[in-house]
Amino acid sequence: MKGIILAGGSGTRLHPITRGVSKQLLPIYDKPMIYYPLSVLMLAGIREILIITTPEDKGYFQRLLGDGSEFGIQLEYAEQPSPDGLAQAFIIGETFLNGEPSCLVLGDNIFFGQGFSPKLRHVAARTEGATVFGYQVMDPERFGVVEFDDNFRAISLEEKPKQPKSNWAVTGLYFYDSKVVEYAKQVKPSERGELEITSINQMYLEAGNLTVELLGRGFAWLDTGTHDSLIEASTFVQTVEKRQGFKIACLEEIAWRNGWLDDEGVKRAASSLAKTGYGQYLLELLRARPRQY
């Protein structure tokens, strides 16, 4: 399985901040935003990842993340010249995917919760169909909403419904089998002129192959598309890290625990960050070897 992070767009809701920098490079407490979706793919056991961004921002991501080797992964980059919809990611990434199943995560979504990695790996092991992740919200009319049966098979999908059929919002995390590129090519532009991911999900639903995985109590799903939500996400990460003493979305730690990075690799990363709390945290990992997250 391969991963795609969609980190394009113009971030208009965050202007003037994003006039000079990609939204996905903004800080969420102690890390760039892009670290958080990257961590999701790594927790799922995915090592080959494509980052899709704008032509203007691609160089900045390459400077930050390189080829991914310092995190034990392989990174490639592609351009989305204009924000023409989430489904376009699979058309842009067709050569990269090369017929393999994939996971798409949006570059401005943050996920956190106990047992997240086993849940992700369980979904990644499925060989057919698609899986979306549902998160219960108080205001479902603001989201894409999924309705499902007792076997967690999707029954309906609605975009910002006036009368929602459930309180389960569809998050920015999707797993697909190898048919996704074929489906993406069939998607027609919506009324707003975009290739909608909901159209792909609807195709899987109509084929009886759309499963819903729930992120229940204890899970956090944060969108960082507004000024207030940026602060809220940073405060959340700060609170958890200070209270519990471990870091959220520490890519070197995930790679190390996955066996993709050895002790020397962690030491090299720590030495370049020696004057920061992040670097000290990496060194402490090697000394204490604390519990799994």
Curated annotation (Swiss-Prot):
One of its GO terms (molecular function) is magnesium ion binding. Mg(2+) binds at D108, D223. Coiled coil: none annotated. GO terms for biological process: enterobacterial common antigen biosynthetic process; O antigen biosynthetic process; polysaccharide biosynthetic process. Binds 1 Mg(2+) ion per subunit. InterPro entries: G1P_thy_trans_s, NTP_transferase_dom, Nucleotide-diphossugar_trans. It is an enzyme of class 2 (transferase). Its cofactor is Mg(2+). Keywords: Exopolysaccharide synthesis, Magnesium, Metal-binding, Nucleotidyltransferase, Transferase. The keyword Chloroplast does not apply. Its EC number is 2.7.7.24. It comes from the Bacteria. GO terms for cellular component: cytosol. Pathway: Nucleotide-sugar biosynthesis; dTDP-4-acetamido-4,6-dideoxygalactose biosynthesis; Bacterial outer membrane biogenesis; enterobacterial common antigen biosynthesis. It catalyses: dTTP + alpha-D-glucose 1-phosphate + H(+) = dTDP-alpha-D-glucose + diphosphate. Gene3D superfamilies: Spore Coat Polysaccharide Biosynthesis Protein SpsA, Chain A. The keyword Lipid metabolism does not apply. Catalyzes the formation of dTDP-glucose, from dTTP and glucose 1-phosphate, as well as its pyrophosphorolysis. Homotetramer; arranged as a dimer of dimers. NCBIfam families: rmlA. Belongs to the glucose-1-phosphate thymidylyltransferase family. This is Glucose-1-phosphate thymidylyltransferase 2.
